[in-house]
Amino acid sequence: MIKNVYIEEPIFLEDLKVRGFADLIIELDDGSVYLYDIKTINAWSYRMKFGRNKEKDPSIHQELQLAVYGVGVKRRFGRLDGMSLLYYNKDTSVIKEVDIDMSRLITVESYWKEIVKEHSLGLPNLRPNVSPVNDWECRYCLYKTRCDNDNRKEFTNE
């Protein structure tokens, strides 16, 4: 049975300098804890992800985002028994659950520890396809104006 449901739960990993919001955390009566991130996509994106001609090398950034939240959930509850991405096709209302391997927790924790270490030495230079991995990430970055005034244009061909 479900004991508690948490929606849009704040996640703050002070030591890793990471903050976000977990879409859905479900805690069961037996103490087990499950984390879900809901991704709303259109029919075309859904076909590209799950159809016969799906992408050969899909991006893992959504898995890694969920894993960051997973680190926070595990710290808060003392355990995390599973984490999944829920893809909601907004055109058909179909939902598909994709379980994410728990090893991603180790991957993201190591990654963010390395980032904190690197930033402790000063603001690092941009590295295309590394930091940022995707151009859309810049919209959420506090240093966007620095990059815009710096040499960002040479990376994006703007």
Regions found by a protein language model. Give the residues of each.
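Metal-dependent nuclease catalytic regions and adjoining charged, substrate-binding loops involved
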Residues: 59, 71-158
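Well-ordered beta-strand positions in beta-sheet-rich domains
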Residues: 19-21, 35, 63, 97-99
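Histidine- and/or cysteine-centered catalytic micro-motif in compact active-site loops
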Residues: 10, 38-41, 88-90, 137
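A short acidic, glycine-rich active-site loop
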Residues: 52-63
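Conserved catalytic cores of phosphodiester-cleaving nucleases, focusing on short active-site segments
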Residues: 20-53, 69
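A generic fold-level signal
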Residues: 17-19, 61, 133
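Metal-dependent nuclease catalytic cores that hydrolyze phosphodiester bonds in DNA/RNA
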Residues: 1-33, 138
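Short amphipathic alpha-helical face segments that pack within enzyme cores
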Residues: 64-72
